Amino acid sequence: EGVTVPVIAEFGPYFDEVSVETPSIEVPGTWLGQMIIDQILPHGYAFAQVSVMGTGRSNHCMDLMGNAEQLGVDAAVTWLGTQEWSNGGVSMIGKSYDGSTPWQAATFGNEYLKTIVPISGLIGVMELMWKNGSSEARAPIMHNGVYGSYGIDGDQEDIGNMCPDYIIGPGTG
């Protein structure tokens, strides 16, 4: 009680999978989760895996690397940095898609985000995925086949997990 710790966070679409369970936490074991549990937590860090919108245990429509997703990542960094158990220092780590979200977060200049460790992440996601405020054709074609599958699982929430721009954007952008 009264102890504060720095936070390491990983943001991405991959966290609706079989989990590793320890006595006090449940974390997806593949990706970086198991390594963080084994190598980082024993040194006094908190660890958060945050599902981007429309994936895992999150809600809202999946806004693949779009403005809403970026604002959500920034809001989550602020939330992590202001918890009573947090010392106010949040770092982000990730590879692949999760390596792009640290770059997204860094663009906001969030006072709680102290460092990023992007591994194989995209820089300039907005330029790649969006054109004139709408998703470009390659956004859903290139990435929804992979990333969209994390938000679409055949249940009634699927319609809510698809942003309207993904339906009309490629045809108009």
Language-model features, listed with the residues they occupy:
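Cap/lid segment of the alpha/beta-hydrolase catalytic domain
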Residues: 2-81
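Beta-sheet entry/capping signal
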Residues: 7-8, 46-47, 88-91, 112-117
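Accessory cap/linker subdomain of secreted extracellular hydrolases
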Residues: 17, 30-36, 42, 104-173
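Catalytic nucleophile serine of serine hydrolases
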Residues: 58, 96-97, 120
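Signature tryptophan residues that serve as conserved aromatic anchors
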Residues: 79, 85, 143-145
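Alpha/beta-hydrolase fold nucleophile elbow
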Residues: 84-96
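Glycine-rich nucleophile elbow surrounding the catalytic serine of serine-hydrolase chemistry
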Residues: 94-104
